[in-house]
Amino acid sequence: MMLELRKIGVLPRDEDLDYPVDEVRGLFDAHGLDVSFLEADAAPADLDLVVALGGDGTVLRAFDRFPGCPVLAINFGTVGFLTAGDRKDLAQIVQLLVDGRYVVSERLVLLCRYPGGEDLVYNEVTLRARHKLLFTDVFVDDAKIRTIRGDGVVVGTPTGSTGLLMSMGA
């Protein structure tokens, strides 16, 4: 799938950190692409692409703030499992993007419904009970698959299960 790249938003991990703003803007401007830097509390905009400058936390924040919008992640953070490359690769990544030499990876998400609301889940959802037995009904596509009895349940996406296993040292 080729993206139409008219409006690109850049979402930095932390506005107070030293980002090469001029370099990033220059790389996109050199190819005639309209790029704007997004503030942390800015309302979601109509964008064709979000470029997340940070680690996996920034990527997840971009998914949450701009649902359905493709996210290109450049690792400026600590954990870069979901990123296309590191800060040093920025010029090459922009060139590959402009040349159309990329693959869009679709990520599976979960819809978690709970009393009082629902949320999209990109990694995993954890339900825990302290000091008591928990009975949890698990549904897939509105069909109950089982009731789980225990002190907790973790349900993860393929992306989230990898992160969860890595955090456990596996």
Summary of predicted features, one role per range:
Residues 53-73, 79, 83-87:
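Glycine-rich phosphate/dinucleotide-binding loop and adjoining beta-alpha-beta core of small-molecule
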Residues 79-152:
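Catalytic core of DAGKc-family lipid kinases
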